[in-house]
């Protein structure tokens, strides 16, 4: 009996002195679950992206030490001066990175240093620095904004040496969605419009002048010099417009401005379809033609001057495409791409002219209705530009629908034109156009009539939205004794979109959450209310999912940070304390 009593005492002591994890395994799963889930895998934003700054005279240095396995988005870095003026600066190119939902983006890893020349800084001047990044494990931080105080600098006391490529106070000029080489093809295509092609024999004769016959080498040289003069005018136009857009790049990214530019592009495209004509005032055109005619044909200087003036004489066929390209370059704010794009555009228009000057009219195709069709085709090219701009405002879903609408219009137009031909190959081409038309219409069909995929998405995304802490507290009070799940979401959070696409769409996850009140806080705007909500809930970043019991108290052990696939999330739900 005494031996049993001693054994019982020793067993009790071993339990009391055992490690906490052993006790958890004895007293149930809840403690073990809580210990595992409450430990965040992710570090605070100040440790993930250690930000520092230093001002030495008229030079401001901004630096970030980036923790391993974390990265900053290049496009999310914004520099906004207050009561100060900066010289030209640019961000490094960054590392190419592909996001499933955002496509190709540039990121920074390990370290980033940015040096900014200060041309002027008044009393109490400062600069707002905004940046945002993520962890490779599937966790994103809200945009961080730091205010850096600046020492006063007068405009005359600083000598600034600008980098070779200029950038605005909001750095990183936007990349053009097209390769500049497309401008070369567009220029060649414009050469075959009804306002341009018939003029080439006349221009060729003016270039050669009335002197004695030239050698083939001399003819080629004169034609190239004329094209280079025209290209110089276009290149200068591109640089001037890009520089102007550079000063207002932040304003040009505003949704209302993007919508206005899109409407302007549509109006330019309509002129290509013959609704109206766009060109320089006749008085100005007459004066430019007189200046051009006064130049001496056959001489290199005179031919170059004629080419430069010809770049300013816009015909109805070239005004709309040139205006569209200039507007888009201004919106991008990229001077290098702006000048290069316009140079290639002029070069494309000049290639057929060089051929005509060198070999004569025999290589030119016959004029006919097909030239008007070429002009109309470029109307569709111009219509692609507003779709690119509106995608930034409306999002990917509506962007896809706009592309679908544009493709339907183009293939329908091409099909109607093909009906005028009666050969065998034309029938095959018509079938291809009909097939393309049906494929292009698919996004609009899914939108109009719905699809099983869309219906399932609507089902699992049936969250009740809460915008701030009072709304959350009210929603918890109205839960009527049911458990509550709060999903913290933002558009800039890639892993949040992965949760939506891969985890919340799972049928087993949906069944497990059938008796749970689903709340969602969309903190995309990162407003003061959103920041207060995240601070109150002690949230480092997104995705973060919180669970509340029936009385409305959070279950700290159940919190989820970072992406979790459907099977892992389902197991997490099944292990929730009841």
Curated annotation (Swiss-Prot):
It catalyses: [protein]-dithiol + NAD(+) = [protein]-disulfide + NADH + H(+); [protein]-dithiol + NADP(+) = [protein]-disulfide + NADPH + H(+). It is found in: Cell inner membrane. Keywords: Cell inner membrane, Cell membrane, Cytochrome c-type biogenesis, Disulfide bond, Electron transport, Membrane, NAD, Oxidoreductase, Redox-active center, Signal, Transmembrane, Transmembrane helix, Transport. Disulfide bonds join 134-140, 195-317, 493-496. It is an enzyme of class 1 (oxidoreductase). InterPro entries: Cyt_c_assmbl_TM_dom, DsbD_gamma, DsbDN, DsbDN_sf, Thiol_diS_interchange_DbsD, Thioredoxin-like_sf, Thioredoxin_CS, Thioredoxin_domain. Residues 438-578 form the Thioredoxin domain. The chain crosses the membrane at residues 183-203, 219-239, 256-276, 297-317, 318-338, 339-359, 370-390, 397-417, 421-441. Residues 1-24 form the signal peptide. Pfam families: DsbD_N, DsbD_TM, Thioredoxin_7. Its EC number is 1.8.1.8. GO terms for cellular component: plasma membrane. One of its GO terms (biological process) is cytochrome complex assembly. It is a multi-pass membrane protein. Its main location: membrane. Belongs to the thioredoxin family. DsbD subfamily. HAMAP family: DbsD (MF_00399). This is Thiol:disulfide interchange protein DsbD. It comes from Yersinia enterocolitica serotype O:8 / biotype 1B (strain NCTC 13174 / 8081).
């Amino acid at each position: 009996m005494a031996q049993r009593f001693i054994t019982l005492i020793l067993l009790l002591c071993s339990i009391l002195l055992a490690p906490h994890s052993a006790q958890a395994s004895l007293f149930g799963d809840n403690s073990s679950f809580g210990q595992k889930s409450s430990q965040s895998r992710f570090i605070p934003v100040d440790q993930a992206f250690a930000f520092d700054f230093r001002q030495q005279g008229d030079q401001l240095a901004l630096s970030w030490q980036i923790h391993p396995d974390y990265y900053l988005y290049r496009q999310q870095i914004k520099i906004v001066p207050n009561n100060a003026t900066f010289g030209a600066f640019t961000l490094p190119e960054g590392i190419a990175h592909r996001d499933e939902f955002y496509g190709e983006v540039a990121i920074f890893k390990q370290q980033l240093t940015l040096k900014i020349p200060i041309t002027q800084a008044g009393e109490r001047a400062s600069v707002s620095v905004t940046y945002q990044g993520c962890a490779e494990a599937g966790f994103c931080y809200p945009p961080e904004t730091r205010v850096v105080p600046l020492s006063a600098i007068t405009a005359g006391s600083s000598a600034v040496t600008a980098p070779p490529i200029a950038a605005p106070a909001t750095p990183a000029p936007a990349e053009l969605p097209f390769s500049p080489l497309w401008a070369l093809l567009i220029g060649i295509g414009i050469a075959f419009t009804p306002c341009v092609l018939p003029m080439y024999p006349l221009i060729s004769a003016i270039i050669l002048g009335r002197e004695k016959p030239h050698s083939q080498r001399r003819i080629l040289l004169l034609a190239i010099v004329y094209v280079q003069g025209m290209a110089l005018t276009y290149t200068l136009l591109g640089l001037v417009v890009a520089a102007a857009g550079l000063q207002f790049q932040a304003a040009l990214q505003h949704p209302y401005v993007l919508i206005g530019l899109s409407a302007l592009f549509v109006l330019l495209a309509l002129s290509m379809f013959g609704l109206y004509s766009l060109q320089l005032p006749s008085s100005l055109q007459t004066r430019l033609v007189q200046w051009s005619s006064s130049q001496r044909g056959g001489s290199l200087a005179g031919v170059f001057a004629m080419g430069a003036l010809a770049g300013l004489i816009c015909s109805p066929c070239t005004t709309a495409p040139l205006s569209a390209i200039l507007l888009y370059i201004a919106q991008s704010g990229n001077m290098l791409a702006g000048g290069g794009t316009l140079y290639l555009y002029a070069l494309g228009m000049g290639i057929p002219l060089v051929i005509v000057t060198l070999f004569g009219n025999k290589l030119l195709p016959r004029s006919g209705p097909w030239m008007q069709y070429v002009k109309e085709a470029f109307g569709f090219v111009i219509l692609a530009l507003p779709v690119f701009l509106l995608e930034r405002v409306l999002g990917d879903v509506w962007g896809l629908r706009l592309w679908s609408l544009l493709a339907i219009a183009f293939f329908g137009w091409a099909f109607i034109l093909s009906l005028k031909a009666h050969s065998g190959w034309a029938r095959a081409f018509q079938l291809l156009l009909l097939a393309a038309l049906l494929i292009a219409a698919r996004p609009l069909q899914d939108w109009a009539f719905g699809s099983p995929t869309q219906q399932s998405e609507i089902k699992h995304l049936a969250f009740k939205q809460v915008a701030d802490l009072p709304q959350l507290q009210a929603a918890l009070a109205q839960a009527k004794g049911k458990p509550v799940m709060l999903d913290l979401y933002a558009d800039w959070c890639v892993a949040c979109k992965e949760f939506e696409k891969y985890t919340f769409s799972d049928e087993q996850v949906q069944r497990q959450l059938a008796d749970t009140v689903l709340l969602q806080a969309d903190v995309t705007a990162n407003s003061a209310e959103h920041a207060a909500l995240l601070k109150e809930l002690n949230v480092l970043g997104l995705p973060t999912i919180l669970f509340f019991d029936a009385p409305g108290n959070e279950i700290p052990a159940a919190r989820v940070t970072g992406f979790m696939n459907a099977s892992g999330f389902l197991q997490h739900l099944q292990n929730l304390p009841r």
